[in-house]
């Protein structure tokens, strides 16, 4: 629930974040770890850190902006722009969302938390982060690059011959099928946290972590749907078109 400006006055950080977990991210952007200043009032934090309350609220409001474009808009976008949109999401995941969650988990004090999965989460998440980053980099350097080659070849017939060997090396159909059928990267964490359930969770720090993980899981699902329902189907059609053109060129020669 978004906490309005008038409701921030004389409120402790713990109360503000408890009512609206996204204020934890907003505070983080101003160099404030909410769990280190939980008993401070917002006015005191603004003075200590040297920022205005209105700036904090403005940043918090910006976090409500829609993560995704309308699918219909992406369906009609040129394919190279769909790729750029997905790369933008990758950049957001790697440089913004995941480092923030990783920092929250690393700084979780488990000494006073009687949940076994807290230590498990501290152990598992760094490995997840590393594997996810490697997956994204591989996707960009191989799959996205290949799809961009298809796009530019379609707009410049001189590039067609350059695609011949790439099309022999990459099975876009198999990649698309594997991507559609693979388990979500978050399935293990989802199971560990019982679908991010806040039942019986008293630690505010842990509640924020769970809600951030849940939000990331949702964002990742949207991202995967764009790849599965828009990017790959359109790229496969384009690949078929270019394959036919290459066959025609070969026949004429």
Regions found by a protein language model. Name each.
Residues 1-253:
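Small-residue-biased structural context
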């Amino acid at each position: 629930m978004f906490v309005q400006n008038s409701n921030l006055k004389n409120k402790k950080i713990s109360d503000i974040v408890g009512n609206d977990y996204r204020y934890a991210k907003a505070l983080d952007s101003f160099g404030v770890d909410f769990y280190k200043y939980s008993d401070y009032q917002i006015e005191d934090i603004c003075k200590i850190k040297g920022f205005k309350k209105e700036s904090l609220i403005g940043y918090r409001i910006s976090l409500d902006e829609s993560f995704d474009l309308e699918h219909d808009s992406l369906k009609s976008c040129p394919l190279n722009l769909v790729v750029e949109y997905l790369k933008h999401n990758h950049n957001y995941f790697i440089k913004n969302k995941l480092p923030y969650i990783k920092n929250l988990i690393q700084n979780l004090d488990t000494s006073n938390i009687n949940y076994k999965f807290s230590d498990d989460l501290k152990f598992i998440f760094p490995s997840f982060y590393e594997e996810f980053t490697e997956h994204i980099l591989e996707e960009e350097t191989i799959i996205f690059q290949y799809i961009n080659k298809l796009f530019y070849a379609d707009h410049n017939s001189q590039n067609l011959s350059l695609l011949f060997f790439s099309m022999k090396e990459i099975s876009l159909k198999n990649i698309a099928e594997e991507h559609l059928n693979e388990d979500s990267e978050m399935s293990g964490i989802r199971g560990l946290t019982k679908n991010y359930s806040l039942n019986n969770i008293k630690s505010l720090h842990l509640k924020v972590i769970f809600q951030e993980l849940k939000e990331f899981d949702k964002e990742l699902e949207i991202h995967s749907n764009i790849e599965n329902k828009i990017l790959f189907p359109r790229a496969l059609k384009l690949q078929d078109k270019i394959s036919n053109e290459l066959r025609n060129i070969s026949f004429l020669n």
